[in-house]
């Protein structure tokens, strides 16, 4: 199972939604880096379930236990492993899913891939629960990047038909609902409440901005910065699309409209616009890196759906039980930050190797 990000950093995520624990092992972190466990805890709480009306009622403390890799509050050079114990599981809600797969979920493809050996409870290894260890790894990477002047921040751009058009010039990480406009946030919450009452779900779009990244980070072709970021962001369950800068809208522009003119500002080369999203030829150009990730609606919904019985090879009806988010987008905001931070730190480490100096 491909649950390992392998670069200058190696990030291996393990566990299942209803297993005794989930966790992550990170190899390649330089020794001696300080780790702020309080800040990491605050970051993980932004993703934690059971905190409000628009998330799953499953409550988990999500307290990381570091088994190795830390000594006296600093990385010690050894692989770092942390786990989060699962304490609130109801596996009985999922017993029928080995035979009747949920539409939109990985139940059927997992059955084909693993021949019935997979753990279906809570979605098993395919569950959004596995974004908790992703956030442990990404939270540590965020701290390392911040000490180098690189800031990664994300916000909700849209949920369903509601869009937040406000400029991303205010922090949202301490808001209970991470949208810039409070008016848009209220409308988004109302839409989530509506689909929840209708036993349905809704998706949305998250925007991420990476500031302070110098020019020259990344590579052409397969090692491009877009490639690295997209690869990690697609590890988040429910992500169905990633676009950088103007993204798909660039296909409707002319070159004279899409090109970002260069200029000199305070002795530094910058661009007057940022349609490229801070990346040219797979390499950062010194402008903010901007991308958006599209999230599909949560596939586990309570209304009756059409499916099939795999054992009987006939069509049947399915009602999904269990505890699920009517919209996973609000809790996914720190996950996008975490995924981006892993990719960016890996690319920064690559650049330092190219320049011939240590971390």
Task: Give, region by region, the residue ranges found by the protein language model.
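N-terminal, positively charged regions that mediate nucleic acid binding
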Residues: 1-58
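A short glycine/serine-rich beta->alpha loop
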Residues: 10-13, 118-130, 215-219, 276-279, ...
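Glycine-rich, mobile lid/loop segments that gate access to catalytic sites or pores
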Residues: 113-221
């Amino acid at each position: 199972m491909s649950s390992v990000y392998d670069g200058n950093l190696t990030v291996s995520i393990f566990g299942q939604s209803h297993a005794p624990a989930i966790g992550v092992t990170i190899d390649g972190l330089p020794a001696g880096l300080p780790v702020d466990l309080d800040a990491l805890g605050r970051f993980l709480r932004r993703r934690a379930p059971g905190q409000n009306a628009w998330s799953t009622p499953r409550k988990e403390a999500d307290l990381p236990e570091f088994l190795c890799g830390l000594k006296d509050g600093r990385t010690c050079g050894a692989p770092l492993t942390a786990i989060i114990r699962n304490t609130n599981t109801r596996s009985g809600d999922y017993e029928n899913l080995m035979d009747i797969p949920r539409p939109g979920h990985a139940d059927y493809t997992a059955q084909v891939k693993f021949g019935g050996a997979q753990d279906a409870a809570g979605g098993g290894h395919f569950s959004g629960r596995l974004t908790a260890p992703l956030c442990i790894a990404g939270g540590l990477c965020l701290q390392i990047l911040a000490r180098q002047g690189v800031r990664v921040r994300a916000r909700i751009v849209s949920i369903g038909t509601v869009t937040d058009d406000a400029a991303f010039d205010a922090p949202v990480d301490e808001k209970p609902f991470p949208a810039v406009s409070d008016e848009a946030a209220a409308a988004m919450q109302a839409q989530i409440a509506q689909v929840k009452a209708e036993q349905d779900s809704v998706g949305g779009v998250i925007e991420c901005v990476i500031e302070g990244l110098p020019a020259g980070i990344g590579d052409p072709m397969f090692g491009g910065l877009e490639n690295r970021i997209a690869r990690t962001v697609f590890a988040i369950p429910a992500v169905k699309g990633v676009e950088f800068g103007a993204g798909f809208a660039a296909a409707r522009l002319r070159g004279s409209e899409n090109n970002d003119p260069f200029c000199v500002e305070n002795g530094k080369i910058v661009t007057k616009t940022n349609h490229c999203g801070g990346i040219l030829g797979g390499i950062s150009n010194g402008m903010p890196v901007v991308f958006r990730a599209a999230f599909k609606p949560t596939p586990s919904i309570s209304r009756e759906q059409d499916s099939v019985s795999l054992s009987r090879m006939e069509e049947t009806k399915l009602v999904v039980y269990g505890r699920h988010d009517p919209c996973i987008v609000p809790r996914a905001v720190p996950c996008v930050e975490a995924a981006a931070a892993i990719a960016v730190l890996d690319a920064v480490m690559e650049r330092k190797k190219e320049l011939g100096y240590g971390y």
